[in-house]
């Protein structure tokens, strides 16, 4: 009798769990535990958490040996060893929310991730289109494999963790925060937008051809004025911007300890270009970095984490998808952040959580993003929710996408956050492109 894994939710958890299938010779040789416990028909994790946690999930085989007569009838039991189940691992993911994410994406290319802004728990992480992992349990047919493999929307790629995109104007909250933190600007600082900026013979255009006129930080964020952020980036410089961006999780893996396919992305600085491209940084590159284009590459989960840390008031969080052995509740996490203390629940070590020099600067950015969604002429005003219990802040943008199998194309990005609630959502739509963090 063969007992096998079953995935009752079909394609809902595919890019979180991965799947199991029979190991090949190399996989057996590379893992001592699998070597010790291998029996014909055994299945191991091939992808996702199934693969990363294989040594915890694998159990020990039960053994029963019998003496039989010439007719094959058992006459005496010689040995009986009880098998043991593998470890039970509980995820932070909420199945109903995960299913709802899949329904929203409806097999279109994109991703949605939901993160608790205080505990860092991943509440949902859905990459679309998905596929049914049960197909791999007993060997997928050639026709079924080719159907998945040749799908132009790339269901085999976990877009939340492995999709690299230019964040576009969704980066503007970090640009604003960095400039405020470094005292380059304040709330009174204004720029006159005529629809373009001339610099050393180059023209850098704002998305609004006729310009926005004189704009302050709040109005520039609300209307996503490129000219304002060109000037702010010019005054700030890419190196100081890089420091702030990396503090908030850009250019770093978010869930790398769980998923070996996650990409770290890139937030460039002058040293990176010199070391990797052998050329010096030019000022025009700073300007386009300030509106989220150029060399920047981010994953949706990074944008989710970035926005979560803005939403919670500028406190560092440790994203996780496995429930801690001693989990901290949402209420306790929120209270500890507000009191200035937060512990890593696994190690009980104090986290260095303050990501800001002046908390007023976080508040200024939150209010500017709130205006973008809830005030007239805001770029995401049409997405607003009038009920005060569910109001959120947001940032829209358009950027060039870099995909593994697609040429560059236009991508709309939208970051949304609920600054006074408990979740951050990252949403990326790749065919009719959009990103949100709520």
Where are these regions (language model features)?
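Short hydrophobic alpha-helical segments used for membrane anchoring or interfacial signaling
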Residues: 112-117
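Single conserved hydrophobic/aromatic residue that forms the stacking wall/gate
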Residues: 429-438
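Secondary-structure boundary/capping signal
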Residues: 24, 61, 109, 189, ...
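Extracytoplasmic/periplasmic proteins that interact with beta-lactams or build/remodel peptidoglycan
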Residues: 1-111, 126-159, 164, 331-348, ...
């Amino acid at each position: 009798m063969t007992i096998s894994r079953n995935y009752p939710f079909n394609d809902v958890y595919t890019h979180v769990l991965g799947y199991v299938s029979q190991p090949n010779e190399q996989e057996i040789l590379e893992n001592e535990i699998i070597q010790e416990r291998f029996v014909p028909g055994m299945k191991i994790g091939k992808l996702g958490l199934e693969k990363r946690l294989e040594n915890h999930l694998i159990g020990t085989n039960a053994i029963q040996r019998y003496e039989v007569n010439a007719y094959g009838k058992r006459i005496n039991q010689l040995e009986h060893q009880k098998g043991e189940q593998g470890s039970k691992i509980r995820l932070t993911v909420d199945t109903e929310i995960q299913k709802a994410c899949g329904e929203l994406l409806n097999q279109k290319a994109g991703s949605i991730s939901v993160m608790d802004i205080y505990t860092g728990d991943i509440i949902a992480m859905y990459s679309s289109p998905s596929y049914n992992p049960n197909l791999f349990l007993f060997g997928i047919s050639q026709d079924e494999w080719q159907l998945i493999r040749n799908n132009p929307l790339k269901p085999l790629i976990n877009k939340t963790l492995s999709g690299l995109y230019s964040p576009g104007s969704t980066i503007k909250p970090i640009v604003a925060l960095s400039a405020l933190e470094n005292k380059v600007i304040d709330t009174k600082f204004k720029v006159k937008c005529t629809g373009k900026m001339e610099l050393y013979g180059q023209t850098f255009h704002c998305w609004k051809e006729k310009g926005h006129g004189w704009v302050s930080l709040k109005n520039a964020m609300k209307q996503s004025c490129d000219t304002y952020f060109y000037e702010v980036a010019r005054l700030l410089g890419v190196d100081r911007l890089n420091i702030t961006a990396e503090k908030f999780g850009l250019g770093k893996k978010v869930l790398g300890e769980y998923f070996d396919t996650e990409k770290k992305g890139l937030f460039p600085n002058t040293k990176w270009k010199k070391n990797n491209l052998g050329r010096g940084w030019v000022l025009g590159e700073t300007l386009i970095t300030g509106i989220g284009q150029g060399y920047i590459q981010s994953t949706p989960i990074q944008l989710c984490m970035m926005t979560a840390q803005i939403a919670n008031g500028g406190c560092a969080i440790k994203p996780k998808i496995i429930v801690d052995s001693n989990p901290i509740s949402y209420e306790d996490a929120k209270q500890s952040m507000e009191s200035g203390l937060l512990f890593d629940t696994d190690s009980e070590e104090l986290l260095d959580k303050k990501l800001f020099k002046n908390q007023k600067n976080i508040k200024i950015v939150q209010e500017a993003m709130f205006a973008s969604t809830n005030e007239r002429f805001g770029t995401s005003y049409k997405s607003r929710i009038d009920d005060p219990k569910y109001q959120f802040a947001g940032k829209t943008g358009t950027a060039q996408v870099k995909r593994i199998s697609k040429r560059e194309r236009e991508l709309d990005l939208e970051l949304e956050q609920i600054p006074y609630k408990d979740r951050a959502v990252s949403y990326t739509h790749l065919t009719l492109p959009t990103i949100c963090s709520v």
